[in-house]
Swiss-Prot record:
Residues of the Clp R domain: 81-217
Stretches the record annotates as Repeat 1: 81-137
Record's protein name: Chaperone protein ClpD2, chloroplastic
Region ranges (Repeat 2): 152-217
Keyword ATP-binding recorded: yes
General function of this protein: Molecular chaperone that may interact with a ClpP-like protease involved in degradation of denatured proteins in the chloroplast.
Length: 937
């Protein structure tokens, strides 16, 4: 008979949530008819969780009170509890939802195993107690109409108002059933108290449990419950003998002001020594003080690139104020740094952010001694508009600050970069005129050294190390030369910081290794060290006793040695050696610079010095017959590695001229493999891909409005990511002439600006261009140079050939391009004797590929002569030789392997038969050791 009454299991949660969602849509402010007119909502509709929860009663409908609100902040559980209470009221035949109905709804919603708020009370038992309290024992009445049409009584309204107030004081952005329960217990309703008394439940214990649950919900979200400790629960005895819980909110501590919440006092931190000292910048700080002392528009804005020290100027002024080294009208001022992110965080309701800003302005005006420092001030422009509705709502923070800034009521020091200032402030002239610009330039290297010397003590204390003067100078010099995309002093400070961190890590590793070495020693070795140390100290003690002036001195010396004997044990010696601060020198700074930039700037090791000395011979192993080119490129690398090259230009700019197939590109690959570690270290651009005029944009990036804008250029992006590399511009004469205009500033100044406005440094690149200009003259040899005789030396012949090639280069390239090239290297045509050496290199590559299949390869001399005969062409260089190797060796071997003539472990002998054709045979006396006997075929 009580089917109409609600229980926790009788109503599906999905239908209840659908009811709540429908109520939200139906009675939201946007959907209210009449453009915001008060809408008469059915009495049983869910209510809005706000401070103005219940408005004045509207005309009655079905004998109830009309509620104008929606469930904007009610949780799903709170919606369920309200709907359950309405159905309980309908089941009991009541016309309104009274507080005891709310109690039944809360009990029905709480499905925990321990019952309602861990009291063990279930909904069936609570329903019986409630009927007995109101004198309606017996069968339930048949429901008439919808359960959600039941209105709320005035007492229930006060419960909801109290729940909203509890939620606000607790710092919650939601209203849960626990908040409703606290409001219910705080109401002191007689019927509710009688129900709880009959159930044998203490309301004060229930209130404490509700507070605990709220705290747990906030902890799950990682939030600190604001003001939760200010709630006190006490018991109050009712006239009928019952008890009710009174939950009081006592906020004795004064609420934090907006300045305390959103600002950081730089002056106080400077007084406590929590801010690094500011070295230099005297002129900039003086200019800032002059602007601050103006009557109106006394707001300086610091403009400069990232890392030049804009924030340090504000901190320097805070130091001066803390030390009293300012004019009399600035004494007692405070510089507060505004945290814009903290100011905006959590302001999701309309008007909340504006209220914070106006409160901040009001407190600054009231204090009278506050100077706000807003770092990255461009973030204020547009803040507060984005993300608020379809078209945005609320005022811009910058617009809120304009009146106070113009009248001088709000003093502000702002900072931003030049690019951000141009992007944001140039569009808002009204805001820009309220700030007076102070340009902060990058300090010179001398000033940067002074700054680092002033900061050295701070970093030495933190990293437990010592910085030498050479390390400070090296940090400034190396960062200025090899880290081009950052600015001083920021990049130099980062170098010493990371070098100190590295030194501390190395010290820890050494300590662990020494400890492990002591533990790994045998007992005999350990005691031998102890006896050796004891013998040394006995000798020292004997000498002190022997040369003491009197007996008392002897006794003192003995006592001193005996007391200090424990300090000479191996363990104490280990701790003493490891506690000694590490020394950071220029080599450590150079090593960090190399790790950072990818450029080897540390001192030459023995292996690297040996590699550089033998670089010529290493390159000649791969490039045959081009000694002049090998010498030119190796000299450039050696000059750069020692540090004698011009720091404002690339390592070298070379152009290789010669006929096709003589090794121009191969020499560049050989250099990358020998010194740079891999052939992939080469940035190769085939200039035949840049034959059109519009293809110039491929190098530096597409301009705005074109596809690919923002992706960067092929050349600039490759060098920006890998500054220490070889740039190969292959077949340069095939590119469009406009390409040469791009290359001019690279060759001369060592930098190039891409489409994004970023300057890319080419100062650590080796630029090589290959060209076939003059190849015809080189191939013709003496026939082209008619004045030569048989008695001419090789040097004269090469010089004459080079001069002839230069004439053709001057006819093809512009003078301003040729004038920026360091050296023009002319490659010799390959002779037949040189072809045999090149053939051996090619056959070694073929052997390596066949060996991967588990098969060896040998080639006879007669076969080599046959390949050289077929592959030699003076006009085409070594490329015909490669084709001959493919046709006479690789094709024949591949056919034999596929036909099953050879298997893994065999060695193939390639020879010529009686007719002079290639033939294959198996060498049985030679085997190949296989790592994997399964062939890859």
């Amino acid at each position: 008979m009580e089917a109409c009454c609600c229980s926790s299991s009788s109503v599906p949660s999905a239908s209840i949530l659908a009811t709540g969602a429908g109520l939200r849509r139906r009675f939201s402010p946007a959907g209210a008819g009449g453009g915001g007119r008060a809408v008469a909502v059915a009495a049983g509709r869910p209510i809005r969780a706000s401070a103005a929860l219940l408005a004045a009663p509207a005309p009655r409908r079905r004998g109830g009170v009309v509620v104008r609100a929606v469930f904007e902040r009610f949780t799903e559980r709170a919606v369920k509890a309200v709907v359950f209470s309405q159905r309980e009221a309908r089941g009991m035949g009541d016309e309104t939802v009274a507080p005891h109905h709310l109690l039944l709804g809360l009990v029905a919603e709480d499905r925990s195993p321990l019952g309602f708020l861990a009291s063990g009370v279930r909904v069936e038992r609570a329903r019986e107690a409630c009927r007995a309290a109101v004198g309606k024992e017996g069968l339930a009445q048949a429901p008439v109409g919808l359960a959600t049409d039941v209105p709320f009584s005035g007492a229930s309204k006060r419960v909801f108002e109290a729940a909203v107030e509890f939620s606000r004081n607790m710092g919650c952005n939601f209203i849960s059933p626990e908040h409703i329960a606290l409001g219910l217990f705080n109401l002191n309703d007689p019927t509710t108290n009688n129900v709880l008394k009959s159930l044998g439940v203490d309301s004060s214990q229930l209130a404490k449990q509700a507070l605990t649950r709220v705290q747990g919900e906030l902890a799950k979200d990682g939030r600190e419950p604001v003001g939760l400790s200010s709630f006190k629960v006490r018991e109050k005895f009712t006239p009928g003998g019952g008890k009710s819980a009174i939950v009081k909110y006592s906020n004795k501590n004064k609420e934090k002001s907006a300045l305390a919440l959103f600002c950081l006092d730089l002056t106080m931190r400077a007084s406590g020594g929590l801010i690094d000292p500011v070295i230099g910048r005297k002129d900039e700080i003086e200019r800032v003080v002059q602007i601050i002392c103006r009557r109106t528009k006394n707001n300086p804005i610091l403009l400069g690139e990232a890392g030049v020290g804009k924030t340090a100027i504000a901190e320097g002024l805070a130091h001066k104020i803390a030390n009293g080294d300012v004019p009399i009208f600035l004494v007692g001022k405070r510089i507060l740094s505004l945290d814009v992110a903290l100011l905006m965080a959590g302001a999701k309701e309309r008007g909340e952010l504006e209220a914070r800003v106006t409160s901040l302005i009001r407190e600054v005006r009231k204090a009278g001694d506050v100077i706000l420092f807003i770092d990255e001030v461009h973030t204020l422009i547009g803040s507060g508009i984005a993300g608020r509705g379809s078209k945005g709502a609320g005022l811009d923070i910058a617009n809120l600050l304009k009146p106070a800034l113009a009248r001088g009521e709000l003093q502000c020091i702002a900072s931003t970069t030049l690019d951000e200032h141009r992007l944001h402030f140039d569009k808002d002239k009204a805001l820009a005129r309220r700030f007076q610009p102070v340009l902060v330039n990058e300090p010179s290297q001398e000033d940067a050294v002074k700054i680092l010397l002033g900061l050295r003590e701070k970093y030495e204390t933190y990293h437990k190390c010592k910085y030498t003067l050479e390390s400070i100078n090296a940090a400034v010099y190396l960062s200025a030369r090899y880290i081009a995309d950052r600015h001083l002093p920021d990049k130099a400070i980062d170098l010493i910081d990371e070098a100190g961190s590295r030194a501390r890590m190395e010290s820890f590793k050494r300590k662990k290794e020494e400890q492990c070495s002591i533990l790994s020693k045998s007992p005999d070795e350990y005691w031998q060290e102890i006896r050796a140390v004891q013998n040394m100290h006995e000798v020292a003690l004997t000498n002190k006793v022997k040369y003491s002036l009197n007996q008392n001195d002897q006794e003192d010396a003995v006592d001193i040695e005996l007391v200090g004997e424990d300090k000479t044990s191996p363990a104490s010696m280990l701790s003493t050696s490891t506690d000694k601060p590490s020394l950071v020198g220029s080599e450590e700074i150079a090593r960090v610079t190399s790790l950072w930039s990818g450029i080897p700037v540390q001192q030459l090791t023995a292996d690297e010095r040996k590699l550089l000395v033998g670089l010529d011979d290493e390159l000649r192993k791969r490039v045959i017959g081009q000694d002049d080119a090998v010498l030119a490129i190796s000299k450039a690398v050696k000059r750069s590695r020692v540090g004698l090259n011009d720091p404002d230009r690339p390592i070298a700019t070379l152009i290789f001229c010669g006929p096709t197939g003589v090794g121009k590109t191969e020499l560049t690959k050989a250099l990358a493999a020998s010194y740079f570690g891999s052939e992939s270290a080469t940035v190769r651009l085939d200039m035949s891909e840049y034959m059109e005029r519009h293809a110039v944009s491929k190098l530096i990036g597409s301009p705005p409005g074109y596809m690919g804008f923002g992706e960067g250029g092929t050349l600039t992006e490759a060098v920006r990511r890998k500054p220490f590399t070889v740039v190969l511009l292959d077949e340069i004469e095939k590119a469009h002439p406009d390409i040469f205009n791009i290359l001019l500033q690279i060759f001369e100044d060592g930098h190039l600006t891409d489409s994004q406005g970023r300057r890319v440094s080419f100062k650590n690149t080796l630029i090589v261009m290959t060209s076939n200009v003059g190849s015809t003259s080189i191939s013709n040899g003496k026939r082209s140079i008619g004045f030569q005789t048989q008695t001419d030396t090789e040097e004269k012949s090469y010089a004459a050939m080079k001069s002839l090639v230069m004439e053709e280069l001057k006819a093809f390239f512009r003078p301003e391009l040729l004038n920026r090239i360091d050296e023009v290297v002319v490659f010799h045509p390959l002779e037949k004797t040189q072809m045999l050496a090149i053939l051996n290199i090619m056959l070694q590559e073929v052997k390596g590929r066949i060996l991967a299949l588990g098969i060896g390869l040998e080639v006879s001399d007669s076969m080599k002569d046959l390949i050289s005969q077929h592959g030699y062409d003076k006009s085409y260089g070594a490329r015909p030789l490669r084709r001959a190797v493919t046709q006479l060796v690789e094709d024949v071997i591949s056919e034999a392997i596929l036909s099953g003539q050879f298997k893994p472990g065999d060695t193939i002998m390639v020879d010529t038969d009686a007719t002079g054709k290639p033939c294959l045979s198996r060498l049985n006396d030679q085997t190949v050791q296989l790592s994997d006997p399964t062939p890859t075929l």
